[in-house]
Amino acid sequence: MSKDEHKLPLSKRKESIIFMMILFAFQVFMVVLFSVWVRYSKNEVNYSTLTPEQLQELEATGGVVQEEVTNIYGYFRDINIMIFFGFGFLMTFLRRYGYSALGYTFIISALVAQWSVLIYGFFETVDHKNDHGGDYASTFEMSQTVLLQGLFCAGAVMISYGAVLGRVTPLQMLVVGIFEPIFYFLNMFIGEMNLEAIDVGGGMYIHLFGSVFGLTIAWFLTDKKSKDCEDNSPSYTGDYFAMAGTLFLWMMWPSFNAAIAPLGEPQFRAIANTFLSLTASTIATFIVTRLFGHLGHKIDMVHVQNSSLAGGVVQGCLAHMNINPGGAIGMGFLAGVISVIGYLFISPFLQRRFNIQDTCGIHNLHFMPGFIGSIAACIAAWKGLNDRSLYNPIEFNQIFRAGEDQARNNAAATFISIGIAIAGGLFVGMILKALKKVGGLKAKQYYQDSAFWHVPIDYPKDVEYVVEQNNLPMPTTDNGDNVVGGGVEMKKHNNNNNKKENGYRRDLIRLLETLVRNEQSTDSSYSDSDSSDEEEKERRIRKLAKKSYRRSKKSHSEHQPQHQPEESTFNNNNNNNNNNATAETTDNGGSSTNSPTSKV
């Protein structure tokens, strides 16, 4: 291959240059502003006036700064693990998109963590002036809590990324990482700093906002080619890694909800309520996924990876409130049930009716549980205002900062969060759609690392490569554990057109039946089928084979077959006996170079 053939297309080179220039300019901008405006948090004491005893005590305790480090750093570490490891690995389920899921999570979260310090500092400075008057502060003190706010914002951006996973370029994700934090902290400025709404774990500001923002930009990036892409499917190994992300998120979620809760009883309640809610949502997930499971009450790994976390999301707003342990379990169970139902019914409806393709199902994991938790916080606030015996005087003032208006303010903040997320998503979505002209993904590059990453030799092969090697359509597995072969472009040639279409159709369907049987013989999901279902299985196999042929023929009708498969590929003994031909091909599928295997 010549040197020129290794070069990126012109549009991709433009995208790469623009990406690097923006990222470099951003970093220079950060260096300048952090140097000029940001200062470390420090103990507000006049050391010259302290007595030796006071200096010794300050040296031993570390003062206010050390107290904050002691109280917060453990949570800061756990949330770091959640953002960079948990969210990253949770999105590695796609068969050919692991590098991008982890890599984009890494770079964009790091960028957002820096950028958030400045944006939060700006709104904090404005709020301080509104409360205390005077001039704007010339510097901003960066504390451990400010760094924590940057991680929270990165979590919202990663939630939005889940909706468009596999359909964005690095440049598009960079735009999301720069603009979404602005809308995120604007929403916090209104809801947290002015309305003083209750939201200890980001149920509104992170989950609800991030999911609505992501679904809005997904509307701009959804097209027929991305919806029909064969690579928008999980792999067995990818699901392993995604489940690792789920487990880390599950274990660390109590820290996420308790990090900024008031010390003492409220912080303990935040940990306990979140943990109990997570256990309940996990139990609910296994119940509902088996109840509605494919092919005889089978467990769906997609549901386990995502819906088991819904209990942590639903507690986001009110985890530190006195809602009773039974209430926490009930909320978690309800969130788990609704999340699984969302994956089964609501996501397909959104894609079909509203043209919103939600790759990771953030609507089901973040939007619905987040909205339920936001409404529950309004109810809990109303109950707490009417029964003050639930809280001691200190924690009551810490939780109910808006006083008698707390329930109304929480309701207002909920819908303001949705409104700002939609407005911000529309603005950013239009930019992302315009950027599709600058190195945007082609139809064959959706859900593939190879578009922007160097990939190793064992990178999962492209469907067209498999077809080229076998001269036959390659079946894939859809969400229903069914084997299909639609959307495959077969390699053609111009020399062998003398056979009629009907004969080719018959042989191709016969081969597809064989491939389905091979897949079933090696797939444990079929190993426990009852013998009484053989007739139904045979009917389904033939139906799938015919459907695969029709889809392949319809999608690529302009092409002609490169060569006709040899008769021996389809029938090792007798061309007139379809059943014997299928059996022979199944038995000898691994011994002939011309017969495709069920594993490529």
From Swiss-Prot:
Keyword annotations:
Glycoprotein, Membrane, Transmembrane, Transmembrane helix, Transport
Q: Which residues lie on this side of the membrane: Cytoplasmic?
A: 1-16, 95-102, 167-170, 221-240, 296-303, 347-361, 433-600
- Tell me the Pfam families matching this sequence: Ammonium_transp
One GO process term, biological-process aspect: ammonium homeostasis
The answer, when asked if Ion transport is one of the entry's keywords, is no
Summarizing the function annotation, the protein's role is: May be a carbon dioxide/bicarbonate transporter.
User: What is stated as this protein's family in its record?
Assistant: Belongs to the ammonium transporter (TC 2.A.49) family. Rh subfamily.
Q: What is this protein called?
A: Rhesus-like glycoprotein B
Q: Which organism is it from?
A: Dictyostelium discoideum
- Highest classification ranks of the organism: Eukaryota, Amoebozoa, Evosea, Eumycetozoa, Dictyostelia
